[in-house]
């Protein structure tokens, strides 16, 4: 029988848009490759290769059928395997609109634990692939599964990509119920305070899950009722199934505005045998439309959005974001903000490294670097998936993510070493394909393992340290390397001796090194280095400086003192910022900045929440996704005193504190920095008492913060948070702690009439202000129960060694940064230091005679004009030579309009000075993901409830002339260009 499947929309009828899709996690219960090929099906029956093979065959059987697909990590794998004939068929399906790409990034990224640069990078990777292969531009965001939605997603990874709409399933259960009653599930979302309506997007929150209505899931092995319309067979049920369809459609129609509603026809890894779905949908379309009471059609998110837009309906306005997300009274998805804190650190560190890899590769010239950054791009793209960086995959899958990142990092390291060898060499670029110098780098600095700096030097050679600065402004920072000798001389490239400070290696680091080098390198390391050697490096913007370390003649003296202080108070800090600690307990008592006069009484401690295992009223446990502390008692204080050791020196003062056998920290105050750097070491978290533990650090001040604090959105905008409050609905407070946690990628701050207190983080984590004047960060978690959201494992990370599998819980080491300012005075520190944390200086090492090196190498150089640096309000967030020879450039303004009187203004970047050593021929401005001309981007107009159009006009930079190449950037603006040299 030939079915009529060609219906379009009908103006006067209820239109049910069937959107066939398969939700394909880029790793979760299985690894990305296991999901692709369909191995390990005892874990989960899932094979994405089958989905794509099967869908393509089904689509060609009927030109009216449609299907949407999002994850380019999978599609790219599939595409590389296809014959020319299959590629031609797929290209026809895409051109005809039957196969539509949604999102189009490498994965469906998480929105809580991702950094905006990573979100842009993987989306660009996918979008440029689609443009090259199909000349197609995705129009719809499809974030159906992430656990809450960010403001940056709404405006930056939405409107600025050229998306008309974004579609998702997960919003807070209280929010959803209110919106159902008001028909406000679908909204116009203005995620940016800065850009308002100029960066708005239509946001469609589904009435429930991202699957079809009950009874309409047609996966081949599901127990569904087929539509039976062959009169020669028993049990025909056309009328019954049409009525079922009608009932479900009319029920959903009560929740939406206009006569259009969407059915998401698919679920996790479905369409393994696509014909099972399409046969049933063909029959439904035919018989429902023949019945005539509603109209049903094959559709896609972009067609659905066009229909909504054409209806001339007025829509509710949504601002800010959709965090935190809860799907039940005791089920706040705020644990994953911190889950697998070490994996989140690796992703953050390699994100900054990937940025520097592409910079240095460009400046050295692609031919000279044997460019291999794709493996790291692929691994980082996969790592942004909403079960990867979020820490919610099974352990074996998490191991696979880590392996991919390590392999990608290894390839990128070769690019950086080769680039630096070429850049520092005095050979011409074309001679540099085989650079003479071989550099090595160190990945395990944080546990003091760096073989190049620990090995003894031959008599006539120095340790050559090349320090590369990936930022667009000059930096003066302390370089810290492990050494075995406190009798070293450090010289700069002019031969000047630098001041060196030595700090004795602490036992905590030595023990970590002994265990983790063995675990990571599968071989025992030599005994820990005896000291940290510290000196100040001065490095030009996007340039490098060279330092030479040699052994001094004669006996050396250590110019750092370890003190036991007399009196009640320990005062430390060689610069403007001072901290006072109790001599008796080691507790922090106050922070004081002698330059600004800000004085803040403040305490800091470590505590842990007991993970709930569920109770008689609700069996919900705390786990990888959810944070549910056990009952309402306050968290357990780890210790009210610490074993404290103070080291003072000309460059840095350090306070080493041990709170118990598994928590310690070092507080560092540098002479030239306005902040305290706190390095924490937590683990193994003990569980022999049968209790899961979620460890926080808490800073308690006297500030009157009125329930308010501010957290970043994906490292970009800061959003105001109010404890126990939601903008969009009257909140019933069921979890006073977990329900007030928010995701951090940059940091958070609080303020009152006297001062502003800021905390920055080095990785994605969760943070809160549970009482006025308090700030807490969750730093590490270890739970003993699964939380029932599908992963099927407790969050119990362990490190195992040797054949006997000696295992212990994972130890996490990381940094956070504290600073105090006058009211409204902290933004400059937050923005600048945030960039320095994201893009640390890169160190590369080799051994050579100092004079020989200086005669054959450039020891200090600039990629840009030596008298120029980027404005302090601008970051270079992408500089990459593409395969077609064009160069991708992205510049980001770092400030919101009212953040800083001087820097929150229109600013200019002179590209001729940025690229002083190369001749820039022309540039084209493109969309954020570089897949379309900026001038050709079209925006849908939406009517918004209560919109009086009184919002301030967003400031954006003007056109760039191909004569002077000056780029203007307004506050929070990101501009993307393709350059031709």
Swiss-Prot record:
Identify the enzyme class. hydrolase
Query: Where, by residue number, is the active site?
Result: 145 (nucleophile)
Give the E.C. number(s): 3.2.1.24
**Cystine crosslinks:** 422-432, 442-450, 800-807
Q: What does the UniProt PTM comment say about this protein?
A: Produced as a precursor which is then proteolytically cleaved into a 66kD heavy subunit and a 44kD light subunit. Cleavage probably occurs in protein bodies/protein storage vacuoles.
Q: Which SUPFAM superfamilies match?
A: Families 57/38 glycoside transferase middle domain, Galactose mutarotase-like, Glycoside hydrolase/deacetylase
User: What catalytic activity is recorded?
Assistant: Hydrolysis of terminal, non-reducing alpha-D-mannose residues in alpha-D-mannosides
Q: How does activity depend on pH?
A: Optimum pH is 4-5. Activity is stable between pH 4.0 and pH 7.0 in the presence of Zn(2+). Activity is stable between pH 6.0 and pH 8.5, decreases below pH 5.5 at 25 degrees Celsius. Activity is lost at pH 3 and lower, rapidly diminishes at pH 7-10 but is higher and longest at pH 11-12.
Give the subcellular location: Protein storage vacuole
Q: Which UniProt keywords apply?
A: Disulfide bond, Glycoprotein, Glycosidase, Hydrolase, Metal-binding, Vacuole, Zinc
So where does Zn(2+) get bound?
23, 25, 145, 386
Record protein name field: Alpha-mannosidase
């Amino acid at each position: 029988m030939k079915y009529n499947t060609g219906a379009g929309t009908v103006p006067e009828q209820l239109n049910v848009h069937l959107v066939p899709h398969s939700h394909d996690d880029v790793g979760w219960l299985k690894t990305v490759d296991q999901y692709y090929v369909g191995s390990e099906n005892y874990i989960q029956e899932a094979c994405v290769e089958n989905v794509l093979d099967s869908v393509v065959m089904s689509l060609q059987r009927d030109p009216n059928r449609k299907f949407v697909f999002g994850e380019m990590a999978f599609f790219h794998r599939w595409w590389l395997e296809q014959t020319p004939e299959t590629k031609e068929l797929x290209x026809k399906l895409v051109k005809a609109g039957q196969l539509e790409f949604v999102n189009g990034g490498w994965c469906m990224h998480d929105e809580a634990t991702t950094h905006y640069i990573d979100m842009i990078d993987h989306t660009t990777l996918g979008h440029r692939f689609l443009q090259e292969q199909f000349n197609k531009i995705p129009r719809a965001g499809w974030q159906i599964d992430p656990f809450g939605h960010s403001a940056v997603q709404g405006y930056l990874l939405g409107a600025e990509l050229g998306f008309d709409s974004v579609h998702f399933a997960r919003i807070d259960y209280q929010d959803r119920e209110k919106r159902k009653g008001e028909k406000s599930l679908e909204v116009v979302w203005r995620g940016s305070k800065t850009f308002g309506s100029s960066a708005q997007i239509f946001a469609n929150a589904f009435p429930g899950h991202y699957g079809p209505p009950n009874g309409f899931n047609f996966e081949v092995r599901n127990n569904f009722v087929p539509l039976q319309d062959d009169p020669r067979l028993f049990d025909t049920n056309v009328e019954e199934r049409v009525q079922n369809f009608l009932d479900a459609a009319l029920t959903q129609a009560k929740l939406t505005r206009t006569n259009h509603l969407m059915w998401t026809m698919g679920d996790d890894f479905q369409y393994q045998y696509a014909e099972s779905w399409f046969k049933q949908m063909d029959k439904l379309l035919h018989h429902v439309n023949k019945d005539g009471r509603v109209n049903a059609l094959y559709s896609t998110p972009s067609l659905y959005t066009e229909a909504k837009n054409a209806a001339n309906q007025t829509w509710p306005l949504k601002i800010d974001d959709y965090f935190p997300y809860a799907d039940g009274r005791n089920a706040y998805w705020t644990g994953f903000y911190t889950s697998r804190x070490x994996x989140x650190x690796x992703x953050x560190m390699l994100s900054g490294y990937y940025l520097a890899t592409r910079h240095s590769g460009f400046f050295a010239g692609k031919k000279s670097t044997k460019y291999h950054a794709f493996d790291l791009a692929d691994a980082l793209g996969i790592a942004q998936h909403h079960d990867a960086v979020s820490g919610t995959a099974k352990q074996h899958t998490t191991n696979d993510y880590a392996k991919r990142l390590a392999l990608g990092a290894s390839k990128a390291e070769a690019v950086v070493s080769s680039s630096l060898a070429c850049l520092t060499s005095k050979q011409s670029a074309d001679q540099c394909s085989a650079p003479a110098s071989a550099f090595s780098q160190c990945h395990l600095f944080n546990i003091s393992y760096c073989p190049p700096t620990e090995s003894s030097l031959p008599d006539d050679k120095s340790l050559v340290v090349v320090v590369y600065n990936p930022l667009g402004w000059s930096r003066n920072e302390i370089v810290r390397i492990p050494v075995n000798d406190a009798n070293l001389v450090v010289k700069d490239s002019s031969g000047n001796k630098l001041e060196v400070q030595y700090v004795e290696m602490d036992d905590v680091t030595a023990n970590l090194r002994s265990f983790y080098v063995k675990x990571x390198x599968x071989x025992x390391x030599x005994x820990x280095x005896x000291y940290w050697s510290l000196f100040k490096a001065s490095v030009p913007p996007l340039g490098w400086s060279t330092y030479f370390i040699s052994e001094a003649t004669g006996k050396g003296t250590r110019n750092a003192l370890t003190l036991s202080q007399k009196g009640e108070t320990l005062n430390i800090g060689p610069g403007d910022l001072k901290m006072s600690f109790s001599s008796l307990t080691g507790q922090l008592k106050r922070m004081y900045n002698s330059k600004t006069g800000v004085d803040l009484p403040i305490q800091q401690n470590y505590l842990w929440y007991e993970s709930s295992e569920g109770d008689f009223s609700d069996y919900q446990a705390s786990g990888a996704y959810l944070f549910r502390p056990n009952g309402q008692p306050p968290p357990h204080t780890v210790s009210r005193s610490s074993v404290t050791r103070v080291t003072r020196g000309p460059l840095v003062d350090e306070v080493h504190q041990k709170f118990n056998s598994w928590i310690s920290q070092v507080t560092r105050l540098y002479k030239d920095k306005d902040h305290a750097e706190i390095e924490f070491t937590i683990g193994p978290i003990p569980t022999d008492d049968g209790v899961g533990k979620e460890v926080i650090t808490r800073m308690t001040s006297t500030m009157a913060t009125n329930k308010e604090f501010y957290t970043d959105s994906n490292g970009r905008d800061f959003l105001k948070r109010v404890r126990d409050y939601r903008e969009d609905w009257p909140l019933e407070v069921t979890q006073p702690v977990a329900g007030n946690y928010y995701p951090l990628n940059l940091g958070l701050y609080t303020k009152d009439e006297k001062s502003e207190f800021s905390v920055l983080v080095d990785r994605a984590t969760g943070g809160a202000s549970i009482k006025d004047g308090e700030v807490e960060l969750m730093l590490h978690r270890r739970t003993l129960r699964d939380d029932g959201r599908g992963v099927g494992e407790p969050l119990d990370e362990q490190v195992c060694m040797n054949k006997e599998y000696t295992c212990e819980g994972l130890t996490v080491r990381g940094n956070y940064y504290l600073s105090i300012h006058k009211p409204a005075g902290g933004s400059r520190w937050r923005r600048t230091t945030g960039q320095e944390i994201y893009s640390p200086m890169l160190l590369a090492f080799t051994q050579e005679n100092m004079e020989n090196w200086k005669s054959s190498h450039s020891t200090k150089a600039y990629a840009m004009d030596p008298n120029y640096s980027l404005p302090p309000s601008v970051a270079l967030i992408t500089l990459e030579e593409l395969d077609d020879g064009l160069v991708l450039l992205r510049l980001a303004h770092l400030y919101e309009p009212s953040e800083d009187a001087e820097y929150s203004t229109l600013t200019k970047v002179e590209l001729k000075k940025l690229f002083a050593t190369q001749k820039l021929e022309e540039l084209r401005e493109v969309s954020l993901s570089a897949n379309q001309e900026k001038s050709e981007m079209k925006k849908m107009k939406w009517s918004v409830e209560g919109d009086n159009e009184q919002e301030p006009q967003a400031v954006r930079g003007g056109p760039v002339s191909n004569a002077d190449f000056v780029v203007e950037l307004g506050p929070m603006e990101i501009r993307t260009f393709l350059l031709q040299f």
